């Protein structure tokens, strides 16, 4: 099948499409995009389940590490105030992990923006295609109404005026038959009229889902950013309660990161299968939803010299009929108007209607050509298979960096918390120190008493 203009499957599409797939019984599953097949659905669920497996392993590792830290920690000698060896290394490991998490957040914001741009391009292509299809229906309806009105009024009046000349009446009736032929042929060109599938509705649904997806990822990114910043603040101020709260929040964000990773991985794999060969699936789905013939769908989705225009015969007959009407009106204007002056007004009105109809007909021919809709199809594929897929991969990288950084933080924070000095140590500060909290409190009380 011919590829849409400007679209070629990317290297990421080929790489993800070649990954092996298996169902729940670990039997191989073809990589062809078939979301309606149960085995293919199981294969995507299994890809998402790998993230759940990673979450379980990371939680087990964190639990074992913390249990070992709590149970196997050597007792501190009484009266010891100096931190044990390696304490600074633990703190710096935690800070490094938080910085990696912050870098992952930047990657996540970029990936979220790329995904949103790709979906926006898809929606714009659908809206433009809907505009083209609506314009075709509108032009056909307008031309048919004009021709029917001309048959009912001007041509009927012209036949009544020319009753004394049978050959002129025959010419007027010939123009009537030609106008009826054009109207009949034009009605068959509005191929999208009555089709239940609306590109406008699809674009609105896609935009609605994308708004909530974008917002959900922004909230997740902001939540992780706040966790990283407040954790750094807790380490800097050696605040035990803040570190405890951030430990709980880090565990929550860790679960969310692994969950988003599974969703992103399954979506990226399924999207790569679709983008590797989109024509066949789109053709079959559109034919099922619209009931249109395969000749029309092949013409617009493929748009190459091997596929003929299914409307060419109707367009040719309509153009010939319009040319015949034009020649007949010229003959009537030349023969009938000098003998029947009252025939001039309907003849001029018919010529005006014919000129407007011919202009609309040329515009309709341009809209019916496959170039416009095929260009929209290619734009939609580029948005979905390039920008959106690239954004998903960046979001997948963000989730991976986030999961690794938060797992490291969860292992490091309890050890860093254990190194914080007890609250009694803060009471040993110099009474003359202006930054001493007790001294500051006494200073405020002294000012209020003045």
UniProtKB/Swiss-Prot annotation:
Disulfide bridge partners, by residue number: 275-385, 303-370
**Positions glycosylated per UniProt:** 130, 284, 355
Q: Which UniProt keywords apply?
A: Cell adhesion, Cell membrane, Chloride, Chloride channel, Disulfide bond, Glycoprotein, Ion channel, Ion transport, Membrane, Phosphoprotein, Transmembrane, Transmembrane helix, Transport
Q: Which residues cross the membrane?
A: 44-64, 89-109, 215-235, 241-261, 391-411
Localization, UniProt: Cell membrane
Q: Which CDD domains match?
A: Tweety_N (cd07912)
Q: Does the keyword Glycoprotein apply?
A: yes
Residues annotated as site: Essential for the formation of the channel-pore: 165
Q: Which InterPro entries does the protein's record reference? A: Tweety
Query: Which intervals of the chain are annotated as region Disordered?
Result: 427-450
So which stretches are on the Cytoplasmic side? 65-88, 236-240, 412-450
GO process annotations (BP): cell adhesion; L-glutamate transmembrane transport
Catalytic activity field: chloride(in) = chloride(out); L-glutamate(out) = L-glutamate(in)
Query: What topology in the membrane does the UniProt record assign?
Result: Multi-pass membrane protein
Task: Give GO terms: molecular function aspect only.
Answer: intracellularly calcium-gated chloride channel activity; volume-sensitive chloride channel activity
The record describes its quaternary structure and partners as: Homotetramer; disulfide-linked. Homodimer.
PANTHER family registered for this protein in UniProt:
PROTEIN TWEETY HOMOLOG 1, TWEETY-RELATED
As for family, the record states:
Belongs to the tweety family.
Protein name per its UniProtKB record: Protein tweety homolog 1
Native source organism of the sequence:
Bos taurus
């Amino acid at each position: 099948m011919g590829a849409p203009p400007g679209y070629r499957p990317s290297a990421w599409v080929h790489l993800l499409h070649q990954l092996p797939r298996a169902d729940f019984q670990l039997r191989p599953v073809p990589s062809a995009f078939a979301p309606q097949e149960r085995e293919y659905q199981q294969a995507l669920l299994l890809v998402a389940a790998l993230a759940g497996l990673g979450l379980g392993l990371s939680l087990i590792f964190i639990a074992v590490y913390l249990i070992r830290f709590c149970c196997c920690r050597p007792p501190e000698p009484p009266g010891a105030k100096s931190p044990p060896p390696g304490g600074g290394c633990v703190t710096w490991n935690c800070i490094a992990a938080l910085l990696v998490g912050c870098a992952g957040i930047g990657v996540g914001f970029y990936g979220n923006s790329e995904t949103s741009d790709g979906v926006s391009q898809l929606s714009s292509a659908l809206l433009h295609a809907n505009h083209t299809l609506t314009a075709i229906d509108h032009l056909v309806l307008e031309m048919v109404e004009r021709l029917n009105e001309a048959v009912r009024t001007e041509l009927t009046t012209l036949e009544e005026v020319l009753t004394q000349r049978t050959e002129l009446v025959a010419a007027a009736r010939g123009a009537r038959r030609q106008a009826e032929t054009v109207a009949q042929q034009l009605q068959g060109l509005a191929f999208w009229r009555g089709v239940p599938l609306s590109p406008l509705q699809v674009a609105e649904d896609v935009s609605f889902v994308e708004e909530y997806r974008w917002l959900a990822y922004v909230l997740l990114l902001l939540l992780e950013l706040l966790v990283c910043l407040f954790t750094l603040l807790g380490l800097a101020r050696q605040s035990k309660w803040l570190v405890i709260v951030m430990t709980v929040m880090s565990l929550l964000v860790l679960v969310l990161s692994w969950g988003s990773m599974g969703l992103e991985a399954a979506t990226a794999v399924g999207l790569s299968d679709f983008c590797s060969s989109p024509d066949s699936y789109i053709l079959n789905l559109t034919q099922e939803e619209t009931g249109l013939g395969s000749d029309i769908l092949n013409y617009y989705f493929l748009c190459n010299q091997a596929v003929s225009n299914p409307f060419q015969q109707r367009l040719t007959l309509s153009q010939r009929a319009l040319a015949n009407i034009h020649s007949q009106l010229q003959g009537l204007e030349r023969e009938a108007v000098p003998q029947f002056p009252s025939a001039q007004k309907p003849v001029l009105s018919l010529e005006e209607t014919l000129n407007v109809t011919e202009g609309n007909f040329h515009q309709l021919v341009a809209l019916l050509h496959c170039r416009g809709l095929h260009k929209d199809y290619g734009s939609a594929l580029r948005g979905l298979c390039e920008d959106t897929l690239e954004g998903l991969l960046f979001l997948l990288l963000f989730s991976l960096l986030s999961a690794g950084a938060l797992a490291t933080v969860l292992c490091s924070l309890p050890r860093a918390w254990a190194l914080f000095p007890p609250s009694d140590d803060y009471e040993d500060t110099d009474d003359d120190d202006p930054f001493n909290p007790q001294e500051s409190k006494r200073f405020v009380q002294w000012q209020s008493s003045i």
